[in-house]
UniProtKB/Swiss-Prot annotation:
The presence of a 'disulfide through disulfide knot' structurally defines this protein as a knottin. This is Tau-theraphotoxin-Pc1c. Negative results: does not affect TRPV2, TRPV3, TRPV4, TRPA1, TRPM8, Kv1.2/KCNA2, Kv2.1/KCNB1 and Kv4.2/KCND2 potassium channels. It comes from Psalmopoeus cambridgei (Trinidad chevron tarantula). InterPro entries: Huwentoxin-1, Huwentoxin_CS1. The modification Phenylalanine amide is found at F34. Keywords: Amidation, Disulfide bond, Ion channel impairing toxin, Knottin, Neurotoxin, Secreted, Toxin. The keyword Protein transport does not apply.
Length: 34
């Protein structure tokens, strides 16, 4: 199960498609892709 927008994470692979893990805040943010 992937993490949605602003979900807690440690790495990009934990986030849903088109999201990336922000290294400082450790939550999933949009990676700019569609």
């Amino acid at each position: 199960e992937c993490r949605w927008y602003l979900g807690g994470c440690k790495e990009d692979s934990e986030c849903c498609e088109h999201l990336q893990c922000h290294s400082y805040w450790e939550w999933c943010l949009w990676d700019g892709s569609f």
